[in-house]
């Protein structure tokens, strides 16, 4: 319903009849701080953040304000957002392997790196017909974790995004 929150009171009224939020961490953090300052209590079932890196202390601040767990999400406009999402273990994000093949490559050589090594996230989509993506270089810096997640899903685990890879002519800034 919302894009950028301009009226916190109106947004919080909407949350009283909601059970979750999906949004930008900065916007959700601003709502959490507004609630704390005005002693407003709203309990949700869960929060899904997207489109920006989120610090652990920000997660804790939001969880405290809304009395629920925060789940991080990795996605791109090009993939209709849904790339990978955290499970209840909160030890990384599981890629949607039925829809997306996710690789980590060395941005200099284009070769796949070992799990645990950082590189550029590259995706291939399986179900996009009009414009499939094949080894699409996202510009995001990340890594696949060596260890499987403790949850029961048998999916790879993408570590939290650690920045951007900038291309400048024949150089990369990592």
Regions found by a protein language model. Give the residues of each.
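Active-site glycine/GP-rich loop and adjacent strand/helix microenvironment
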Residues: 2-174
